Amino acid sequence: MGANASNYPHSCSPRVGGNSQAQQTFIGTSSYSQQGYGCESKLYSLDHGHEKPQDKKKRTSGLATLKKKFIKRRKSNRSADHAKQMRELLSGWDVRDVNALVEEYEGTSALKELSLQASLARPEARTLQKDMADLYEYKYCTDVDLIFQETCFPVHRAILAARCPFFKTLLSSSPEYGAEIIMDINTAGIDMPMFSALLHYLYTGEFGMEDSRFQNVDILVQLSEEFGTPNSLDVDMRGLFDYMCYYDVVLSFSSDSELVEAFGGNQNCLDEELKAHKAVISARSPFFRNLLQRRIRTGEEITDRTLRTPTRIILDESIIPKKYATVILHCMYTDVVDLSVLHCSPSVGSLSEVQALVAGKPNMTRAEEAMELYHIALFLEFNMLAQGCEDIIAESISLDTLIAILKWSSHPYGSKWVHRQALHFLCEEFSQVMTSDVFYELSKDHLLTAIQSDYLQASEQDILKYLIKWGEHQLMKRIADREPNLLSGTAHSVNKRGVKRRDLDMEELREILSSLLPFVRIEHILPINSEVLSDAMKRGLISTPPSDMLPTTEGGKSNAWLRQKNAGIYVRPRLFSPYVEEAKSVLDEMMVEQTDLVRLRMVRMSNVPDTLYMVNNAVPQCCHMISHQQISSNQSSPPSVVANEIPVPRLLIMKDMVRRLQELRHTEQVQRAYALNCGEGATVSYEIQIRVLREFGLADAAAELLQNPHKFFPDERFGDESPLLTMRQPGRCRVNSTPPAETMFTDLDSFVAFHPPLPPPPPPYHPPATPIHNQLKAGWKQRPPSQHPSRSFSYPCNHSLFHSRTAPKAGPPPVYLPSVKAAPPDCTSTAGLGRQTVAAAAATTTSTATAAAAAASEKQVRTQPVLNDLMPDIAVGVSTLSLKDRRLPELAVDTELSQSVSEAGPGPPQHLSCIPQRHTHTSRKKHTLEQKTDTRENPQEYPDFYDFSNAACRPSTPALSRRTPSPSQGGYFGPDLYSHNKASPSGLKSAYLPGQTSPKKQEEARREYPLSPDGHLHRQKNEPIHLDVVEQPPQRSDFPLAAPENASTGPAHVRGRTAVETDLTFGLTPNRPSLSACSSEAPEERSGRRLADSESLGHGAQRNTDLEREDSISRGRRSPSKPDFLYKKSAL
């Protein structure tokens, strides 16, 4: 579908006939040749003094040439001014900001390409070949029967005679209507299906069946010798139109007064009638088909057959002018709209021509003729003729015809496709339009549509300037209309003497421009000290200052050109070509000059939340274009109309639309638009949705069909991207609001096995993966799929990334087993925020207690908040900036509880499993100042946020039966910068590394600590207090110092809330692994140290020294407040 929308303007060239050179000359110059400015329109003659007119002509031509030079120079200076203004704006910018602006322009350019394709989309018109195939299949108006192997084939005499010399000779012997001709074919091997395929080929030029015998050259040669080799279908049909052999219908034109005479038997001259074939006109036009079938039902056709006279069709010339009849028939036979075949004599029945003659207007232009013919095509239901007229009108768009075409296409009977092309011309040539007189004839609606476009080719200063001029002109017209009739046309009228600017009423001018000025992007006006802007503000037309003049919370000035530095609602700059080219030029120069800065990572931020409440209210990107109006339980049937006026199409058409939508999504152009417009995926999806709707002939208001198809077809499945509709509880899907704790992102396990096509995401801070990392992902178990919730086509996001978690509810304190990670409290829950009570359960030897503890721990793991999985870096960044000014020396009491290692087989301790597998890539960013150490026995790797592979989309909740990878597997448990809520991968929390202990000693070492009312854990009397002194400015070590006499260790512990954490930030800070990822050791050194650590406890001091050295290496890159911080501070 929509093949005609991709090759404009070349798509219209085959349909438009006539002289191509004359058509090219017509565009933009037609009004002059039609209005008497040609060579033949000589208004006067001079018998004497031929030299004076020649001299005057020379002087005029010389002055005109000089004027053109000045105009050309002024235009070039204007373009140079735009480039100079953009260069001055970017003079003080950083190279990253210029790069961000250029990327914004590239994203807008990709959207413009999709918007252009959508504006060119329209339903595919039926071609001559398709209509002839339907004619052979449905047997409209057949007049002869072919008998072959006792099978009757009704056919059309004129088509077979024009296509095949064999049938021309055969049918000439039986000229009567309905003759039966027995076929005797000498070629061997011709059966009934093959004969039917031969007839189908004569009608369409293609074989209708896939038969291997048609690949045999010998059979084709024998058929060509017997039947002859036909020409192409276009050539033979053109010959049939020219000679009209075996015609069986005539078209007569008359006014209402002549209809009685026509029926009374008064025949017009045959030269005044047009001959045609019933088969062709019934195949191409449903209007003529229904007319001829009605004549057959009423018996009128039998009379014509008895008298052997052609069928006469009388048309009202006031509806279908006679001069267009030849153009209509020519298009029916050839699929080409050729206005050059118009009859020389005008039709007196044409109402528009009568009005033109009365008004004294010149002859109709080519565009006006195409407009009138377009209405006739719609009346005849002849889509090929209608689209050909649309192409002619679109080619005729110029400054002279723009207003007339815009007005005509705006009417209900006008063409929406032509209206989109006229608006596109207005936006592309707006700089030329606003400096001409045509600009003041534009209506407010057309002007409003133009200035709302992101692709308007004009600077904001010129838009504001000429909008005010347009408003002043409209106000002068109002004043002229209000003046008395006695002054109209006199020297005292407003049109003659004019109105001074100071005499205009500002209130009335403001009322005229009130609906237009809000769409002028004042923040993007260049130069910044624009006189046009200051004058408009002095006159009171603009009351609010631009947002870049307003101070932000950081005390500086915002940048309205950049998305991440905008103070308010971001409005992207228009894709003005001089600005775009100059910005790219400046970026190239800066990248050459600042090579060192370019090597740094340029992080693109798009729609990044700037406050914590926006992180809390975050929803999947696909949801903000969906209405989610699900079918209620009391509603018996789905809706039958869309947008209260458009009927819902049939299911087969709906499936074709969804298939076409998926096909467009996988194209390179759409994927590029998705990649360049991160965060604007809904806009990209909407462009391709309205393109599909227009290709299927539906209005743009029916976009909900593709955004939420399950609302209209609840029992159907539309491809891989559309699960079945489920009955959802109220409040289950909430857009831009805080979801209730009980219903937030529940029942999403089904999307684990759901992999829609995705655009390539941006790759900021992506840690390199290892083969072991992928093996661990592949080892995750997949949950059984449950019922799918409603899914939209607005944005192809991956719902498998949102894992199933439920909000914590009131109940007994959870118990953590050594094999389960201690989850931080859910900051998105309103109940018990920051007051999560945690207690260590006393382990018993009974299996019942162990099973109960395992169930409680599994429930706690499932209560991990979805927030930190969605946007971990954003949440941690917010908590970091809110705590960076509150750093005070504190006496941190070590509240960590120690538990013995769970029973395991012989081998190295599990807390040493990550020592030989530390990652050698050491570059990473630290978001927080207070790093808490969290341990667990079973290290677990979370799926990467930017990894959309099948192995990555697995549930992250560990099962109790999962096996911990041994150290020989080389599992990588380094930091995942997009999973900050993980616990540390090792159980190392003291200053020394203990050896293996017996299970009996481990059982004796288990203790239980009660909680105090203030939330801190009580210690036993024999346990010393561990102090962690923080200096000023604090550079806290990541490893707490433990007393050497404390020999009880355990891989699982619970982290309490420290003094610097608040209710809003508790649980958002990342748990930094106790073993740093920074390591520069050789493999030999690491293996040697691993053996030494596993042998005895005497190397604890050496290990502590190595850890402190690694911590000092990574400390320089940890604090965001350092002046030599390598990464640019974000908009947070």
From Swiss-Prot:
It is found in: Nucleus. The modification Phosphoserine is found at S722, S1012. Its main location: nucleus. Residues 1-24, 897-1019, 1035-1132 are annotated as: Disordered. Gene3D superfamilies: 1.25.40.420, Potassium Channel Kv1.1, Chain A. Residues 1-10 have a biased composition (Polar residues). Residues 142-211, 247-341 form the BTB domain. InterPro entries: BACK (IPR011705), BTB/POZ_dom (IPR000210), Btbd7 (IPR042345), BTBD7_BACK (IPR047936), BTBD7_BTB_POZ_first (IPR047934), BTBD7_BTB_POZ_second (IPR047935), SKP1/BTB/POZ_sf (IPR011333). A lipid is attached at G2 (N-myristoyl glycine). Keywords: Developmental protein, Lipoprotein, Myristate, Nucleus, Phosphoprotein, Repeat. Residues 918-927 have a biased composition (Basic residues). Residues 928-939, 1000-1019, 1083-1093, 1105-1114 have a biased composition (Basic and acidic residues). The keyword Metal-binding does not apply. SUPFAM superfamilies: POZ domain. Residues 413-479 form the BACK domain. GO terms for cellular component: nucleus. GO terms for biological process: morphogenesis of a branching epithelium; regulation of branching involved in salivary gland morphogenesis. The keyword Repeat applies. Acts as a mediator of epithelial dynamics and organ branching by promoting cleft progression. Induced following accumulation of fibronectin in forming clefts, leading to local expression of the cell-scattering SNAIL2 and suppression of E-cadherin levels, thereby altering cell morphology and reducing cell-cell adhesion. This stimulates cell separation at the base of forming clefts by local, dynamic intercellular gap formation and promotes cleft progression. PANTHER family: BTB POZ DOMAIN CONTAINING 7, BTB_POZ DOMAIN-CONTAINING PROTEIN 7. This is BTB/POZ domain-containing protein 7. It comes from Homo sapiens (Human).
